[in-house]
Design a protein with these regions (language model features):
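Short, flexible coil/linker elements and helix-boundary hinge sites characteristic
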Residues: 5-8, 39-42, 65-66
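Conserved beta-strand positions in the Rossmann-like core of class I SAM-dependent methyltransferases
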Residues: 16
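Conserved SAM-binding strand-loop segment of SAM-dependent methyltransferases
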Residues: 40-52
């Protein structure tokens, strides 16, 4: 928000949140209310309490029921769930173009977020590093890197300190990518131990 407040062309900030975990809904609402009160620009928000993947299946697959002009965003920020799904899970079936075998929900979120971006829109995601190699993620990598240009990567070297209160034991990264076919000459890479 601080950066958006500095841009004179931005008159209004429109935030859409997808969250279907009732355990965090009260905290999310409090944070959105705080943001609304403490920003220099007009901020409007909407919380969609639905499945992020399944709510957009028709648009993603361009079916007969798809919206002719689905909503696209300038910025998408994501901290998706790290859950392995069965290969016949509804989310996996909805995004077969990026799935090979039993997918992890986090990369389906990333693929859907790339779909949700306007041209030159940017996304920032915190995810496991595992998507960067191996045959299991090849379809996702090919589609994602065909549509998006990585701009910055931050690696957490610790496997257990990124989410101290959770049982996530993976190498984790934050990446920033832009929806464009222009590739940057350099990608900024940084690391931290914790």
């Amino acid at each position: 928000l601080d950066e958006l407040n500095k841009i004179s062309e931005v008159q209004e900030i429109d935030v859409t949140c997808y969250e279907n975990n009732q355990d965090v809904m009260e905290l999310l609402q409090a944070n959105l209310d705080w943001m609304q009160k403490h920003t220099a620009k007009k901020l409007v928000y909407k919380v969609r309490q639905e499945n992020y993947i399944l709510s957009q299946t028709e648009n993603y697959n361009k079916t007969f029921c798809a919206e002719p002009d689905p909503r696209k965003y300038d910025i998408v920020i994501g901290n998706p769930p790290y859950i392995k799904l069965p290969k016949d899970a509804p989310e996996a079936m909805a995004m077969q173009d990026v799935c090979y075998g039993a997918p992890n929900l986090y990369f389906l979120f990333a693929a859907m977020s790339a779909f949700d971006l306007k041209e030159n829109g940017e996304m920032v995601y915190i995810v496991p590093r595992s998507w960067t190699s191996g045959a299991y993620f090849k379809r996702f990598r090919n589609k994602f890197l065909g549509e998006m240009a990585l701009q910055q990567i931050h690696l957490f070297e610790s496997r257990d300190m990124v989410f101290e209160t959770e049982s996530v034991l993976q190498e984790t990264m934050i990446f920033k990518a832009k929806r464009t076919n222009k590739r940057p000459e350099d990608i900024l890479m940084t690391t931290t131990q914790n």
